[in-house]
């Protein structure tokens, strides 16, 4: 088998592994609130999330184009060795944070891995700093927006339903949480699965297998399937952190968090902007908790999560740089 074909197959395999890990790593984003409030049985929640993640992943390719075309100046600055190294850095980081039950951003991990590998390969001239700035800005702004809008959504719900008894409210919102969890799962797939689509398409472009950056249908199906399979495996360690350690959720607050998260994420998808679903969901829960009372949020846990988020890009950049040297040693 020619070396280029071997490299392309390696990229596709690692990208699908990244998507699979992203699925079980980020399953918590789609179902943590509905499981923690017992609106859905865990197994039912996972089946629903897997199916809707698949449908969401097939929705569009705008985010894939942003990831594949905006981090580097052109496909000439990226070869398969760089892409493999970036994926290794992202996969290793995701596994580390999953093992320690720390909600982390797969988006940050992938961006950091690409930056580190490109810097070692061709230097800073290969990076599109305008595109990177746009991506990083969306990653930073999205959880802050989620906090504010989550607080507003919860405040509105309190105003509308505040005169009813808690038991009556929570009984109704338990059923509505099924809908909000479904919306969350679809929006998660519509944004997160596209990141690996963008990486695979970039590899196909740099290898000369396609002439323009358009995501092939088979790439969409492969990425969507990998995400759905990962979702079916589930990430129970992180579900516990997101579902209960930040703020004790009730059905009404769980509904508000899911509704808000799905709106923020899907809006980003329509704008072709990659966001961290982990950050957005966590931000929504913080905002919902703040609407109840500020000290209801466990800010110590939130601070630990923010620390992990801040460290993700620099750590994965280093991992991507080291992995690039390793990949060169293996393939050259």
Residue locations for each model-derived region?
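Multi-pass alpha-helical transmembrane bundle typical of ion/small-solute transporters
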Residues: 1-332
């Amino acid at each position: 088998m020619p070396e280029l074909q071997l490299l392309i197959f390696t990229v596709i395999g690692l990208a699908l592994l990244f998507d699979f890990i992203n699925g079980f790593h980020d399953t918590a984003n789609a179902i943590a609130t509905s499981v923690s409030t017992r609106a859905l049985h865990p197994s039912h929640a996972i089946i629903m999330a897997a199916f809707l993640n698949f449908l969401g992943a097939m929705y569009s390719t705008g985010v894939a184009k942003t990831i594949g075309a905006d981090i580097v100046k052109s496909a000439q600055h990226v070869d398969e060795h760089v892409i493999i190294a970036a994926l290794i850095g992202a996969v290793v980081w995701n596994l580390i944070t999953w093992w320690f039950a720390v909600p982390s951003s797969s988006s940050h991990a992938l961006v950091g891995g690409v930056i580190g590998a490109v810097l070692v390969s061709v230097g800073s001239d290969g990076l599109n700093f305008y595109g990177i700035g746009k991506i990083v800005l969306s990653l930073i702004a999205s959880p802050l927006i989620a906090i504010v809008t989550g607080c507003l959504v919860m405040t509105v719900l309190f105003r509308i339903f505040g005169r009813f008894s808690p038991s009556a409210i929570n009984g109704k919102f338990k059923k509505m949480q099924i809908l909000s969890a479904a919306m969350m799962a679809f929006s998660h797939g519509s944004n997160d699965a596209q990141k690996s689509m963008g990486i695979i398409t970039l590899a196909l472009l740099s290898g000369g297998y396609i002439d323009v950056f358009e995501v092939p249908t088979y790439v969409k199906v492969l990425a969507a399937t990998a995400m759905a399979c990962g979702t079916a495996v589930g990430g129970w360690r992180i579900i516990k952190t997101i579902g209960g350690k930040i703020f004790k959720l009730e059905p009404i607050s769980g509904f508000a968090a899911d509704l808000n998260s799905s709106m923020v994420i899907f809006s980003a998808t329509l704008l072709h902007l990659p966001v961290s679903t982990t950050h957005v969901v966590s931000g929504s829960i913080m905002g919902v908790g703040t609407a109840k009372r500020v000290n209801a949020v466990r800010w110590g846990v939130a601070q630990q999560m923010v620390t992990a988020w801040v460290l993700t890009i620099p750590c994965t950049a280093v991992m991507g740089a080291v992995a690039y040297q390793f990949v060169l040693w293996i393939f050259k």
